[in-house]
Amino acid sequence: MFGLIGHLTSLEHAQAVAEDLGYPEYANQGLDFWCSAPPQVVDNFQVKSVTGQVIEGKYVESCFLPEMLTQRRIKAAIRKILNAMALAQKVGLDITALGGFSSIVFEEFNLKQNNQVRNVELDFQRFTTGNTHTAYVICRQVESGAKQLGIDLSQATVAVCGATGDIGSAVCRWLDSKHQVKELLLIARNRQRLENLQEELGRGKIMDLETALPQADIIVWVASMPKGVEIAGEMLKKPCLIVDGGYPKNLDTRVKADGVHILKGGIVEHSLDITWEIMKIVEMDIPSRQMFACFAEAILLEFEGWRTNFSWGRNQISVNKMEAIGEASVKHGFCPLVAL
């Protein structure tokens, strides 16, 4: 059985959907309450592959909120993720994806040292960040979006915002090895990590956001920012493709300009309906079929019997692993969201 650990996009979102999640008493509560709220299994469902195989899964709501990071409630954030992982293990989930900020909190605060959660010793082989599948899906979205807009990738300038992260660095490797894109613009906060990535790739220009964006034919946004940013659409190239791989996805409401096309990055659509409630709550356009690619990775690992931490650690994603999870994705009926 597989699992998905997720969270809501904000305190306001959490209050609005608390009743749908099954705990209406949380609806009027503030951040202090959510900091102490325990994780809960809020959805049970089946997923059917186009091969005919059927598997069962559970959704674990961690009760983590991005405000816990922005308001420096770090201990609460750490506790949320570890407690949700412990619950997933206690209810017998064989492979569980850490969705949204869950994997970021785990990596940034080095939680692999915290493997004892009360009476549960965490087995990290039972968890995956889902980042390999997410990176694969974003790359396929770049390829499809570029084709739809008539952008030749071999002649394109691609800016990757969040280039040193797990997903961003994987996207850079794919675009370099598969397409030899003309220019890779590397954007991130940590200069040393940028220089390390540049050395690994043997290419790429390190730039700040304001300098890079006007030069880019394609922008891949995979920065882990709890709050959205402002991008002036008029300063971007036309046409310009933006693949919004962040969470929550809000660039489509923040960047409005003719000739600027935005794809919801890291989203896949399944060929068959899934009877779950959670994707309605996170406001997918077609909740019975669409989901985050990181969640789909846990589903694929369960279908394939690869019960291991397929995506784990920082900057470990190879093009070969992206190809492997991509083949499984196609085999079981998933496809990236590519309609502009």
Curated annotation (Swiss-Prot):
Q: Per the entry, which co-factors are needed?
A: a divalent metal cation
The UniProt disruption phenotype note reads: Abolishes the presence of alkanes.
Q: In this record, what's one Pfam family?
A: Shikimate_DH
Provide the top EC class.
oxidoreductase
The protein's Enzyme Commission number: 1.2.1.80
- Purpose of the protein: Catalyzes the NADP-dependent reduction of long-chain acyl-ACP to the corresponding fatty aldehyde. Involved in the biosynthesis of alkanes, mainly heptadecane and pentadecane, by producing the fatty aldehydes used by aldehyde decarbonylase.
Please report the name of this protein according to its UniProt entry: Long-chain acyl-[acyl-carrier-protein] reductase
Organism, as annotated? Synechocystis sp. (strain ATCC 27184 / PCC 6803 / Kazusa)
Lineage of origin:
Bacteria, Bacillati, Cyanobacteriota, Cyanophyceae, Synechococcales
